[in-house]
């Protein structure tokens, strides 16, 4: 009997963690031992068509637009408004959000998006299935949703950031990572920083490097186009987002 695994991610738009998840799912899909499901918390993202055929998307509704496009932003705001109305979340979580905002002001790290993830997670669709493993592939909403709203025999969470710089706190998390059976930072520095915040999670925190399709990168490197000057030496290109939370 195949093991049932649910992955949860905030959106499926074009970004590093999402690309790494797609590659991991492709590898797992080649094995016949897993029944793979995916829940996209915000229910949107343009990379849905790149999922391997064996992955079942459990969202009742899904919009194939990027959160960076104008229509995608409008859909994102609608999702947030809906989450605020479900279960009286806006009122029920008001004290939590005020306290979290107060801490952000005190530490001079005001990041409104971090305040909304709890409300979005609490207002998202619920899954009736019980899984062998549930995986929160991102911090924030995905982690809160898996910790509090998914039935699973085992739960795991990935950490893609420097947790001390990303704007999250134990108060904001409600200590959600103590509810997981495994935590996987994607690098050694990420592991070190996470354990500064959650030292009691050390026994089940292990580095899990992102899965990268090296053949695809080499193939694209040889594709037509590129620099038009006459330089024939070695070029080194780094692509990334330079923000404090990147570990």
PLM segments and residue spans:
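Conserved donor-binding/catalytic core segment of Leloir-type glycosyltransferases
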Residues: 6, 227-246
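Conserved nucleotide-sugar donor-binding subdomain of glycosyltransferases
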Residues: 85-133, 141
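Nucleotide-sugar donor phosphate/pyrophosphate-binding loop at the beta->alpha transition
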Residues: 113-123, 143, 160-179
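A short, basic/aromatic alpha-helical/loop segment that forms part
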Residues: 14-15, 214, 243-247
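Active-site proximal beta-strand in glycosyltransferases
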Residues: 5, 133-139, 144-163
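Donor nucleotide-sugar binding/catalytic pocket of nucleotide-sugar-dependent glycosyltransferases
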Residues: 154-160, 164, 178-219
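A short helix/loop element that forms part of the nucleotide-sugar donor recognition site in Leloir-type
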Residues: 122, 174, 217-231, 235
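N-terminal strand-loop element at the rim of the active site
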Residues: 14, 32-107
